[in-house]
Amino acid sequence: MTVMSGENADEASTAPGHPQDGSYPRQADHDDHECCERVVINISGLRFETQLKTLAQFPNTLLGNPKKRMRYFDPLRNEYFFDRNRPSFDAILYYYQSGGRLRRPVNVPLDMFSEEIKFYELGEEAMEKFREDEGFIKEEERPLPEKEYQRQVWLLFEYPESSGPARVIAIVSVMVILISIVIFCLETLPELKDDKDFTGTIHRIDNTTVIYTSNIFTDPFFIVETLCIIWFSFELVVRFFACPSKTDFFKNIMNFIDIVAIIPYFITLGTEIAEQEGNQKGEQATSLAILRVIRLVRVFRIFKLSRHSKGLQILGQTLKASMRELGLLIFFLFIGVILFSSAVYFAEAEEAESHFSSIPDAFWWAVVSMTTVGYGDMYPVTIGGKIVGSLCAIAGVLTIALPVPVIVSNFNYFYHRETEGEEQAQLLHVSSPNLASDSDLSRRSSSTISKSEYMEIEEDMNNSIAHYRQANIRTGNCTTADQNCVNKSKLLTDV
């Protein structure tokens, strides 16, 4: 503990790291003293002692800035007192001692340690590194258009919860998607199926040749499909011209799905027109198999629902984060299929009633056995084959069970991130007695917003920051007047 001389020294002069002016006659002696000067930090009764130069490595933090830490100084005990979590401070002090390495103690929960990082003002960079070390996926920031009108249109179509009209557009979009999927399914019913697939066939009636054609343009299913495509095309074009980056627009998988959803209609329309012209000349323009494959692509419209469903978004994020585990699962299954299909083939080779004519023919049996489906269309009949089948089923259960916990853990992370963000959006969390600096407030006003939750918080500031009184500090999916980017993370407002 450092003892300062002078009985009538004020509080600032008695604080560690704040010597009274003129107390050191020579600058060299002052530097040597400050280099070795120690400071005592009391964390809820547990005292820590370190050198001032250790804290001075990070002057923008609470402990590294003499002015910021002064309000916690106790002149009677000549120490700084913080009524904070004691186990967490071991890691906080190590952050200063190691030059920026942050490690969470195993007995401290994630949320509590995050609060300590915010309280000691270690900075956004330290928080991001901590989240990455803990396995959190780095949040993606999306820029917004610079023009106000373009920005409003983009928010209207991209963020359904940003306003009432945006919700209406989202509801209309979901209804159109559902109608399109229902039409896709209903048109295959035999009682509703048209004979348009047989366009161009020739029927002989009373020794006369008649070319039978069906007009697709009068088909009710085609009319409803056309209305759906008009909406999909309008939505896609508006979002394309309103997006802040045309390159990023085409890189987005959801926009690619939107394009794929409307392409089959225009291809089908072109082929139908070509076939009608071909029928007039007595020839068929397009193969029915090609048309059926093109129509099959329409089923991908169901993925458009993921734009409006948090559950599907969570599932997609889980699969994306679990690609390594899924790759290992497929690799293990591949090895098992090769191994057990070969084993069962040679085990059943001498059996006349064997269902396995070759090793590739046994691939199907190995897959359904390892996945414990067991259709029963192929099965071993010898003792050796049954032993191989038993081992195949056991190996399949173990292989599938290995990566499942990691995938479930990823799902829980994304699910709780969504639900916790909804809870945080209902509260204004105060984690520090310090008001934000001008630079922090201006940085926040440039703002990052969450993609899922919206909340508008209006804080009445005191007279010292009256120029911020009229500012609306928004977190969640709300925007400010000078907002330039969108952050998909969940935010807490610290005042």
Curated annotation (Swiss-Prot):
Xref: SMART domains: BTB
Induction: Down-regulated by high dietary Mg(2+) levels.
Cellular compartments annotated: Cell membrane; Cell projection, Axon; Membrane; Perikaryon
Positions carrying Phosphoserine: S23, S322, S437, S439, S446
Biological processes per GO annotation: brain development; cell communication by electrical coupling; cellular response to magnesium ion; detection of mechanical stimulus involved in sensory perception of pain; detection of mechanical stimulus involved in sensory perception of touch; hippocampus development; magnesium ion homeostasis; membrane repolarization during action potential
Keywords: Cell junction, Cell membrane, Cell projection, Cytoplasmic vesicle, Endoplasmic reticulum, Glycoprotein, Ion channel, Ion transport, Lipoprotein, Membrane, Palmitate, Phosphoprotein, Potassium, Potassium channel, Potassium transport, Synapse, Transmembrane, Transmembrane helix, Transport, Voltage-gated channel
Transmembrane segments: 165-186, 221-242, 254-274, 288-308, 324-345, 387-415
Further facts: The delay or D-type current observed in hippocampus pyramidal neurons is probably mediated by potassium channels containing KCNA2 plus KCNA1 or other family members. It is activated at about -50 mV, i.e. below the action potential threshold, and is characterized by slow inactivation, extremely slow recovery from inactivation, sensitivity to dendrotoxin (DTX) and to 4-aminopyridine (4-AP).
Name of the protein in question: Potassium voltage-gated channel subfamily A member 1
Organism encoding this protein: Mus musculus (Mouse)
